[in-house]
A protein has these predicted regions:
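Thiol-based oxidoreductase modules, predominantly thioredoxin-like and allied folds used
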Residues: 165-180, 190-202
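Conserved Rossmann-like nucleotide-binding pocket used by diverse enzymes
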Residues: 113-116, 142, 170, 195
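Thiol/disulfide oxidoreductase modules built on the thioredoxin-like
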Residues: 190, 197-232
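Conserved redox-active cysteine motifs that mediate thiol-disulfide chemistry
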Residues: 135-137, 141-161
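Oxidative protein folding and maturation machinery
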Residues: 1-130, 134-135
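Hydrophobic beta-strand anchors of alpha/beta hydrolase catalytic cores
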Residues: 138-139, 169, 217
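Generic short beta-strand
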Residues: 115, 176, 216-218
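Short alpha-helix adjacent to the SAM-binding motif of class I
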Residues: 151, 158, 180-187
Length: 232
């Protein structure tokens, strides 16, 4: 869209060169979020009105995937319970139910999952050991081989420099090779907490946090509850 292209031009691309037009970038992102919210609301209304249509099942599946960590468990259940009994037995409903179950694991308002990861010293440690009680925490999932992930790191460095004392950042890599992960951390100058799930797409990050692609992040409130996901 034109708005997304404007964001790339005004904020994302300049940030790669160390130029952070933060105020302008945030203004565009807020507008992008408003557009997305209106689209999601319209999709939800369509599903309610056409709750006996297979098309609504397809839309519901897309909505669940695109709003993970934005919907609460109650909202997910409300969406799923809104279909007619006849549609509950449709073959496509099985796929939608599986998606809904995955999204419940990372629903907004749910508590974060404490998983065991590896730190830079090679120690197996619980994620909770790196959480900062009483503060907002951000889990940033990435990998050294992921070009979009590497492209996001300048933004993360800037965020750490500006908000590092009050906002706890934890990057969690899904690199399977220890050397690749550590080399990337050093190359990118990532000074905040660094952990790794070397089981990759089959490890606890993929299972407990439903991370099927990177980069992806989840923000937790001071009580360890999920506030939102996919924040950029």
């Amino acid at each position: 869209t034109a708005l997304w292209n404007e964001y790339l031009k005004v904020y994302h691309v300049p940030a790669l060169d160390g130029i952070f037009n933060t105020e302008k970038g945030m203004k565009i992102v807020r507008e992008l979020n408003r557009v997305k919210a209106r689209l999601n609301e319209a999709t939800g209304e369509f599903i309610k009105v056409h709750n006996n249509s297979v098309v609504s099942l397809l839309l519901a599946n897309n909505l669940l995937n695109s709003t993970r960590s934005e919907m609460t468990v109650e909202e997910i259940d409300g969406l799923m319970n809104g279909f007619t009994p006849a549609l509950q037995n449709a073959s496509m409903m099985g796929d939608v139910k599986k998606t809904a179950e995955r999204m419940r694991c990372v629903a907004r308002g749910g508590t974060y999952h404490d998983i065991v990861l590896k730190n830079l010293k090679g120690e197996n440690v619980p994620l909770s050991e790196y959480m900062k009680p009483g503060a907002y925490n951000m889990l940033e999932f990435w990998a050294s081989w992921c070009s979009p992930c590497r492209g996001e790191i300048p933004h993360l460095r800037h965020l750490y420099e500006v908000c590092g004392k009050d906002f706890n950042m934890i990057s969690v890599s899904i690199d399977e090779r220890d050397t690749d992960w550590k080399k990337a951390v050093q190359e990118e100058g990532m000074q905040w907490h660094q952990l790794c799930d070397q089981k990759g797409r089959k490890g606890p990050v993929a299972i407990e946090y439903q991370v099927s692609g990177v980069p992806y992040c989840i923000v937790l409130d001071p009580e360890g509850k999920i506030v939102c996901g996919g924040v950029r």
